[in-house]
Amino acid sequence: MATIINLKKKSLSALKAIAVTHFHKFIRRRDQDKPCISCGKYTLLQAGHFHSAGLNPVVRFNEDNVHGQCKKCNYFLSGNLLPYSQNLIDKIGQERYDKLTHAVQLSKQTGFKWDKFYLIEIIEKYKALNR
């Protein structure tokens, strides 16, 4: 409870940064023994977003949108999205892929704003999952 009270005092940008840290740690741990979602190499992985987190904040913390990705594909190949998309469909299935894409399209029409309580919920969820 004390943690939640301390989190409520933080700004949205500070909460988002904390949430990103815990979420990315979860993704790296979840996918640590798997190959890069784009190129298939077994190497140190980062949390690579299929739909850009900056352009599509609604799916920033969506586990179907973020997978282990090598630094080369994530940074130097801008996500290496063509093989990422096919491997993503293979991994999560067409239905979940379509749902993810629909969420992005819908948010572009309706807009999306961060909420302190939503971010605190994400922080608490992924902090617990990382224990």
What are these regions (language model features)?
Residues K16-K25, F50-N56:
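Short Cys/His-rich Zn2+-coordinating modules
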Residues V20-Q46, C70:
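Short cysteine-rich loop/turn motifs with clustered Cys
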Residues K34-I37, G79, D98:
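Short, solvent-exposed positions on alpha-helices
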Residues L44, V66-I92:
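Short Cys/His-centered divalent metal-binding micro-motifs
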Residues I37-V66:
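Histidine-centered nuclease catalytic patch
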